[in-house]
């Protein structure tokens, strides 16, 4: 396998840290454009000296990395946000950024791997899902060497989803159910997802080229079933409270004003859309040559910390 020069946008995020370490372990060279260089210290420790190149980067000046894109073999875009701030909108991060990066990658004939989101659609009131769909559509229309990966919920030891609700069981007598807990998800384990992205990077298989690929795990759960699983792992009685849509939307608007909101109005809107792709897991299993990981089995290991000590 030929070692490649890979530029990763979003290398300090939950998925980015895992992917960077995996690619470094395979001997690839990584260029990591970051706003705060100190954030990538953990990744540096997993690579050899000179194997990772950290460069300053800000989305307000995307063309500052064009020379680095020209020198790379593959561009991976993992940039994404779950809530907006005055200086970073969904439209900017999910549409404008991938548009400009895709154009530069196309100009220099570089392969572009874009990580989006399962459930993205222009038929939605959710700005998050809408902006994700716009980014995908631009790449599909204007780039000639791309792969778009669309994960459902990604879980792992440092995730902000299962851990958040596990933490809530320690302090709340119940967990909230939005949309009656009926929204469906097909969660994928972080290591499975980054192994799959790594496989795409290493492979010249045409099955990955110029395609949008749903990245999901082996099991489909409703939101309520996920919370029930968390209660089982932390050994607590299952207690829920159904939040009517009116109060859920109000709660989302109020919480959305916080610096790091645990729930927003846009997230409430996104719960009107399932995040599943039945059968798509088989394609990933075939690509990896193994079965995908069970959420309950994996999560049991890292949610134990929320079990009350006797």
Feature names for model-found ranges:
Residues 4-26, 33:
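N-terminal Rossmann NAD(P)H-binding glycine-rich loop of SDR-like oxidoreductase domains
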Residues 9, 33, 78-79, 112-118, ...:
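SDR active-site strand-loop-helix element
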Residues 38, 46-99, 104-106, 118-122:
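NAD(P)H-binding glycine-rich loop region in Rossmannoid oxidoreductase-like domains
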Residues 137-167:
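Conserved beta-loop-beta element that borders a ligand/cofactor-binding pocket
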Residues 156-164, 200-213, 236-237:
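Glycine/proline-rich active-site loop of Rossmann-fold NAD(P)-dependent oxidoreductases
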Residues 160-161, 179-202, 211:
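Substrate-positioning beta->alpha
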Residues 182-191, 213-232, 242-253, 291-294:
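Substrate-binding strand-loop-helix patch
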Residues 246-309:
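A hydrophobic C-terminal alpha-helical subdomain
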